[in-house]
């Protein structure tokens, strides 16, 4: 990381690992992905004064259309997970105010049907397509700078999935 960015803070964020009854995990392909490599689980910033669980349910609803009554919160990560953006993205995302994200992750069990997932529930949409994948597949689908965090989240939640 460029020393000019090292003093920037991390953006407070919540991540959601949504699992179905078969133990598969939701991933969405980012709508701005041109290369087919930017898949991710739902995640987003925590607003000032917002608590973790409501932030997770809000992000889930905005990005997937999944209503709160269709999920059960199973677990919360023991610690926050940090990642740094590549230097070339720091000035382009979040107004250049953050060096990366500080994420707390929640594991949620999905009790709905696939038809309850609506990527067009929020404008603008976050994802262009989605699928269920095995937890072990996640890190290989994710942009390289987030892979370490995804491995940590999979390892932490593996026995609960």
UniProtKB/Swiss-Prot annotation:
PROSITE patterns linked to this entry: NUDIX, NUDIX_BOX
Pfam families membership: NUDIX
The keyword Cell inner membrane appears for this protein: no
Known cofactor(s): a divalent metal cation
Entry keyword annotation includes Ribonucleoprotein: no
Enzyme Commission number(s) of this protein: 3.6.1.-
GO terms for biological process, alphabetical: nucleoside phosphate metabolic process; ribose phosphate metabolic process
Protein name per UniProt: RNA pyrophosphohydrolase
Originating species: Novosphingobium aromaticivorans (strain ATCC 700278 / DSM 12444 / CCUG 56034 / CIP 105152 / NBRC 16084 / F199)
